Regions:
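N-terminal Rossmann-like FAD-binding beta1-loop-alpha1 element of flavoenzymes
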Residues: 5-35
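Glycine-rich FAD pyrophosphate-binding loop
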Residues: 27-51
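Conserved beta-strand segments of alpha/beta enzyme cores
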Residues: 32, 54, 80, 219-222
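Conserved donor sugar-nucleotide recognition element shared by glycan-biosynthetic enzymes
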Residues: 45, 182, 205
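Glycine-rich active-site loop/strand segments that organize a redox cofactor
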Residues: 46-66, 123-141
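N-terminal Rossmann-like dinucleotide/flavin-binding domain of flavoprotein oxidoreductases
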Residues: 62-66, 70-76, 209-220
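Mobile amphipathic helical/loop "lid" adjacent to a hydrophobic cofactor/ligand pocket
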Residues: 71, 75, 80-179, 195
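Helical element adjacent to the flavin cofactor pocket in flavoenzyme catalytic cores
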Residues: 185-233
Length: 233
């Protein structure tokens, strides 16, 4: 059995992106730590697997280039990001329609304006929301918290816009489809998608946690071990 360090100050449970970031900070500050992960890989909800020559991503499907903290921890030049145009292609049950940001992709301005996924009021509200959340910082938001769904209703978005765009798009980010996630987190994510670009590493999303892992001493990581109890020895 592997011998564990005896002078651990910090135990980090889970080697997802947050756990890896914590481990990197502990190492930078010379704080003894142990990172424990139940799976045989790091990344948590951020990962990939290969089968028959194809890469299949697990959990989160894209990386947002506007996440400053993560960018500062990654070697961005080595993960070879490929970028998507800003916007979304939505199937309304009959045809595909485009909702794009006309301020960042002028070629799609007419397709966006004439899309019946949203009302004219919805389109105006999107632009107003985009403007109001420019430079948004979640720790400076003193507004009353509520669910994302309630926030969208209070902002005036139509049910069709919520069901056809917000729910499917943000369900893939929140990993829950009722939009019960905090409206403050929604505002943070929305603001970042409007300032950055959705991207995909050339070799799949697993490239991101693997890149973070390079900054951590392997002797401080324990894979395929599940934490079942936390208490005094």
């Amino acid at each position: 059995m592997r011998e564990l360090p005896s002078d651990i100050d910090t135990v980090i449970v889970g080697a997802g992106p947050s756990g890896l970031a914590c481990a990197i900070q502990c190492q930078k500050n010379n704080k003894p730590f142990l990172l424990i992960e139940k799976n045989n890989r790091v990344g948590g909800r951020l990962g990939s697997f290969n089968e028959n020559g194809y890469i299949f991503d697990l959990g989160f499907q894209v990386y947002n280039t506007a996440y400053e903290v993560t960018n500062s921890l990654l070697d961005m030049g080595s993960i070879n990001l490929n970028y998507f145009k800003p916007g979304a292609v939505i199937h309304d049950g009959t045809d595909f329609q485009i909702i794009s940001d006309p301020l960042r992709d002028i070629k799609q301005v007419f397709g966006t304006l004439f899309s019946d996924i949203s009302t004219l009021g919805d389109k105006i509200r999107i632009l107003k929301l985009k403007s109001s959340l420019r430079g948004y910082e979640i720790d400076r938001d003193n507004s009353k918290d509520k669910t994302t769904h309630q926030f969208l209703l209070d902002t005036g978005f139509s049910e069709r816009m919520i069901e056809m765009f917000f729910r499917p798009f943000f369900s893939g980010i929140f990993l829950e489809n009722k939009l019960e996630t905090s409206s403050k987190f929604f505002k943070y994510v929305f603001s970042r998608f409007n300032s950055g670009l959705a991207s995909l590493p050339e070799n799949g999303m697993q490239s991101i946690p693997d890149n973070l892992l390079k900054n951590i001493d392997g002797k401080n990581i324990l894979l395929e071990k599940k934490v079942v109890k936390i208490g005094e020895q």
